[in-house]
Regions:
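Short, Lys/Arg-enriched N-terminal segments with co-localized hydrophobic residues
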Residues: 1-8
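Glutamate identity and glutamate-enriched acidic tracts
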Residues: 5, 18, 51-54, 63, ...
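Generic N-terminal initiation segments characterized by hydrophobic and/or small/turn-forming residues
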Residues: 5, 13-17, 26, 56, ...
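N-terminal single-pass transmembrane signal-anchor helix
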Residues: 9-38
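Catalytic cores of transferase enzymes with a strong primary signal for eukaryotic protein kinases
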Residues: 15, 19-24, 56, 68-81
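Membrane-proximal N-terminal amphipathic helix
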Residues: 42-71
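Periplasmic/extracellular, small/polar-rich flexible segments of pilin-like filament-forming proteins
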Residues: 65-172
């Protein structure tokens, strides 16, 4: 009887070594890719939050300047339901109704918090806590203060520098 050497002709599939190499490659790709993906997501949320902040600041600044230039013509702002509300000129930063009208305007436009997309990007001036990505507007004496908290690249909360508009400089 002759001994016949086994052949690999009819074997189908992968060897254990080949499978282990593929699993190791997938593990390395996941170890590198997942943190990078999370970093990209965090960067995009931070960028969107800062764009919202700048949009709010520019809008309020423009509306106050238009108020002065147009000789007291009331501002027409959008309300939460998409309708129009008017705010008298000159603007009173201490008036919660004025602050609320600005907040409602951005909620009516559908501005969302990038960290919590189900919620508006603005919070109420009643002093409620503001989560990251949330923009608050508050008025004191002759100053509008617009604030925002965001997460930095390390995931730590940071405050966007306050933007202040001194009303006495614009209204006369």
């Amino acid at each position: 009887v002759r001994y016949k050497e086994p052949t690999m002709r009819n074997t189908k599939g992968f060897t254990l070594i080949e499978l282990l190499i593929v699993v190791a490659i997938i593990g390395v790709l996941a170890a590198v890719g997942i943190p990078m993906y999370n970093g990209y997501i965090a960067d995009s949320k931070r960028t969107a939050a800062m764009e919202n902040f700048e949009r709010v600041v520019k809008f309020i600044d423009t509306e106050i300047l238009k108020c002065r230039a147009m000789g007291g013509t009331p501002m027409r702002l959008r309300d939460k339901s998409g309708g129009v509300t008017t705010v008298p000129c000159p603007v009173d930063s201490k008036d919660d109704k004025t602050n609320q009208a600005f907040l409602d305007h951005f909620e009516g436009l559908g501005m969302k918090n990038p960290y919590y997309p189900a919620t508006p990007a603005t919070t109420r001036p009643s002093g409620k806590a503001c989560a990251e990505g949330c923009i608050s507007i508050d008025g004191h004496n002759t100053v509008f203060a617009v604030n925002m908290t965001y997460l930095d690249s390390k995931g730590e909360k940071q405050k966007m520098p306050q933007w202040l508009r001194y009303l006495h400089q614009i209204s006369g």
